[in-house]
């Protein structure tokens, strides 16, 4: 069982199945839906670097806002803290991509903080004094959020505020930037490898 209480079925046989057979008769009008996520790493095909960094927001002693502390790979996340999720998209020189989408993978229980009103943050852009936090437009997805990128013609920084409500150890697929009308053209975080996040 997953921490959320739902069941997870893992294939135990040797090799991968090529078909699925059901025993018994199904009632008329029955429908079967099979969903799966491949654990096989995907390869990026677009010459764009996608870098993801998480920052924990720690309150400043004078109460004027927060200080952003960059986390390293493997650092534990706290369910009672607020985080900045930062992506930097960098295309190769002279390359321009239009109508793209950034899809950020999230673990169960994670959500984008919908309001950033009144939040002042120091340390994201080298600033020592807190400045108003501004986030990109986004839309919620299934265990993800998406940010439209109308045009990518140079380094672009995208940030959101995140909270984590569910504790556990989660394997996240790579986040990706892809072209809306050529979805096979994509760039991935961490060379497409799974990332493990621990939420306490």
Where are these regions (language model features)?
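Long, domain-scale non-catalytic interaction/scaffolding regions in large secretory-pathway
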Residues: 1-200
């Amino acid at each position: 069982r997953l921490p959320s209480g739902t069941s997870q079925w893992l294939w135990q046989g040797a090799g991968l199945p090529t078909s699925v057979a059901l025993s018994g008769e199904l009632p008329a009008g029955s429908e079967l839906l099979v969903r799966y996520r491949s654990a096989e790493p995907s390869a990026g095909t677009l010459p764009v670097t996608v870098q993801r960094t998480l920052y924990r927001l720690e309150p400043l002693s004078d109460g004027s806002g927060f200080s952003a502390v960059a986390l390293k790979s493997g650092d534990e996340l706290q369910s009672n803290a607020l985080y900045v999720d930062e992506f930097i998209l960098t295309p190769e020189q002279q390359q321009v991509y239009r109508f793209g989408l950034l899809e950020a993978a999230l673990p169960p229980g994670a959500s984008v903080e919908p309001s950033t009103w009144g939040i002042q943050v120091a340390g994201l852009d080298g600033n020592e004094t807190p400045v108003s936090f501004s986030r990109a437009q986004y839309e919620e997805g299934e265990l993800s959020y998406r940010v439209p990128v109308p045009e990518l013609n140079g380094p672009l920084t995208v940030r959101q505020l995140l909270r984590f409500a569910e504790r556990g150890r989660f394997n996240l697929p790579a986040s990706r930037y892809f072209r809306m009308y050529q979805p096979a053209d994509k760039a991935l975080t961490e060379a497409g490898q799974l990332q493990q996040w621990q939420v306490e």
